[in-house]
Swiss-Prot record:
GO CC entries: endoplasmic reticulum; endoplasmic reticulum membrane; endoplasmic reticulum tubular network; endoplasmic reticulum tubular network membrane; membrane; nucleoplasm
Positions carrying Phosphothreonine: 211, 213
Any single biological process term in GO: blood coagulation
Assembly mode: Homodimer; homodimerization requires the C4-type zinc finger motif and decreases during mitosis in a phosphorylation-dependent manner.
Signal sequence extent: none
Single GO molecular function: identical protein binding
Biased segments, Pro residues type: 185-198
Name by which UniProt lists this protein: Endoplasmic reticulum junction formation protein lunapark
Gene: LNPK
């Protein structure tokens, strides 16, 4: 009957074996921690109680039981010299006992871990994909660690601030493999691809998790629909961007820095932060006077943030020639001149203006390298412009000279004849 029942008794499955091994491993790990705590506790109590007892006995013997003879005192102090050695030997024995227990525990723990590793290798070779994936996720310590480390990063990427989304997305894009697997190749048994939710980690040796990146991109992209510029899909492939527009002041500043900032009137409290309009990242700080007129490129998303205001520009001053002004003032102060002198002065003025224009054109040719045709055109235009007011001035001077001559020359009737006046006097 026993043989029949033994035949009907089913063999434990790999999951049950792994569960029993896992329980034993947990028990051994707990025992190891407990053994270490007991070792520290026993050694600490031994040192504490022995030191208190040693001091107390020394005090009592010194006050009441100390003999007068030297030999008796020496015999009395010998136990006090031997007591620390005894306590030290007891401490070493306790440490040796607990260390032996810890070694036996570690050996058993290593054996169980090696058994579990062998069973997991057999599972990866023999079991189907789905069962192998479940067993590895449940009993493989590497997959457990990956699963424990993954949800905080995924949750942080989902609930992150707008300034951190691009950095996490670029990190996820860099982790993607450049060559996807071909559809003709069947999935090997030890390289499973996780069909489950995106948060579950894949088996060890499998391809990188592609399901996390679309979820992140789908959660991140709608936030930037209303932003001034749409995000670029291959942003993680950009080279490192330009330096920040303004240096970031250190957070920890000494007393001397604070005093200098107070005297100069500079510091973080007197500056404005440069925040990117697209990814809301911090790009340094700018002075109050420059904040409205500064344009910068983000160091994280490379978005060009335009200036809030355009800097006002002063009106352009008119061109002024000191020599021409002296000539005009001199001609106005002298007054009207004869027509010949006016013409000569005008000719001199035209020659001087032409020479001055030629010199200016030569200097401009050396500085700006203007072609020869443009220089001649400019000289002709300036000469024509200078001749027009000079012709007007000539006509005005001629009219004024004619009027003066008419006023100074008397009429023929009004001129007295000296001969007639003399004859009239003699006749009288």
């Amino acid at each position: 009957m026993g043989g029949l029942f033994s035949r009907w008794r089913t063999k434990p499955s790999t999951v049950e074996v792994l569960e029993s091994i896992d329980k034993e491993i947990q028990a051994l790990e707990e025992f190891r921690e407990k053994n270490q705590r007991l070792q520290k506790l026993w050694v600490g109590r031994l040192i504490l109680y022995s030191s208190v007892l040693y001091l107390f006995t020394c005090l009592i013997v010194y006050l009441w039981y100390l003999p007068d003879e030297f030999t008796a005192r020496l015999a009395m102090t010998l136990p006090f010299f031997a007591f620390p050695l005894i306590i030290w030997s007891i401490r070493t024995v306790i440490i040796f006992f607990f260390s032996k227990r810890t070694e036996r525990n570690n050996e058993a723990l290593d054996d169980l871990k090696s058994q579990r590793k062998k069973i997991l290798e057999e599972v990866m070779e023999k079991e189907t994909y789905k069962t192998a994936k479940l067993i590895l996720e449940r009993f493989d310590p590497d997959s457990k660690k990956a699963k424990e480390c993954e949800p905080p990063s995924a949750g942080a990427a989902v609930t992150a601030r707008p300034g951190q989304e691009i950095r996490q997305r670029t990190a996820a894009q860099r982790n993607l493999s450049p060559t996807p697997a071909s559809p003709n190749q069947g999935p090997p048994p030890q390289v499973p691809v996780s069909p489950g939710p995106p948060k579950d980690s894949s088996a060890p040796g499998g391809p990188p998790e592609r399901t996390v990146t679309p979820a992140l991109s789908s959660n991140v992209l709608p936030r930037h629909l209303g932003s001034p510029a749409t995000s670029v899909p291959g942003m993680g492939l950009h080279p490192p961007g330009p330096p920040l527009a303004r240096p970031i002041l250190p957070r920890e500043r000494g007393a001397l820095d604070r005093i200098v900032e107070y005297l100069v009137g500079d510091g973080p409290q007197n500056r404005y932060a440069l925040i990117c309009q697209q990814c809301f990242s911090h790009n340094g700080m700018a002075l109050k006077e420059e904040f409205e007129y500064i344009a910068f490129r983000c160091a994280y998303c490379f978005f060009l943030n335009p200036a809030r205001k355009t800097r006002p520009q002063a009106p352009r001053l008119p061109e002024f020639s000191f020599e021409k002004r002296q000539v005009v003032e001199g001609s106005s102060s002298v007054g009207p001149l004869p027509s010949g002198s006016v013409l000569s002065s005008d000719n001199q003025f035209n020659e001087e203006s032409l020479e001055h224009d030629v010199l200016d054109d030569n200097t401009e040719q050396t500085d700006d390298k203007i072609p020869a045709t443009e220089q001649t055109n400019q000289v002709i235009e300036k000469a024509s412009d200078s001749e027009e007011p000079e012709e007007k001035q000539e006509t005005e001077n001629e009219e004024a000279s004619v009027i003066e001559t008419n006023s100074t020359v008397p009429g023929a009737d009004s001129i007295p004849d000296p001969e007639l006046s003399g004859e009239s006097l003699t006749a009288e």
